[in-house]
């Protein structure tokens, strides 16, 4: 799940979910959250367009859920890619929780992108956390530690946890000096980590060429500014001396499957 808004810098998270949908064997809409009570339409205006016959089409902000059929023996995947609502976050979280329960989900993964001190010359780091302590330990993820004012995603995570659903949050750090959309490297990094943690093939390699082109474009811009080039070099040193934000290894997907089996047996 990913929503356009404060925690989707450069559209990296929603691009990742949209890529999963477009890569599926098939997709079926299973739910649509009515935008009427959740949006201030003076801030998020509907879009009018013309079809092939010249008839006007009005498109309202959408938060739709799709069930995707994937390759192999992977169970179906339900995705929500939409827009962060302005109003009634608690009611919106309840709507998402209802979709998750009706679809039989036991795990919800939210994707996000935030501006950070990340050099564009390095693989972009992904921060991961899990609401379930056993799952967090098995996957080498942290537990949520933030305290203070929160947004829709924070309210959503709490509600899903109260429903008994495990929640994993994956957030990629986007270079704060280049936040324009699209950012194929950020999208690739999110998809790669999602695949690593869940074992679901995400096709992240398809972003490799676009990510390289994006990096070359930023390289050229940075090279023309001595101060910026020096700043990026300092960021590189900082990142090179830090540890990876998520563990690597094929055993992570196996650990997730073991957790799902254990929780099924307990239920």
For every predicted segment, state its role.
Residues 117-201:
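Catalytic cores of processing enzymes, dominated by hydrolases/peptidases
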Residues 27-28, 76-79, 106-108, 166-169:
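Structural motif
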Residues 1-84:
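N-terminal short beta-loop-beta anion/metal-coordinating cradle
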Residues 75, 83-134, 156:
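Internal, conserved structured core segments that host functional sites
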Residues 178-267:
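A conserved C-terminal secondary-structure "cap"
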Residues 1-2, 81-82, 110-112, 171-173:
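Short beta-strand segments
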Residues 3-7, 80-89, 139-147, 177-181:
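Flexible, glycine/proline-enriched loop segments at strand-loop-helix junctions
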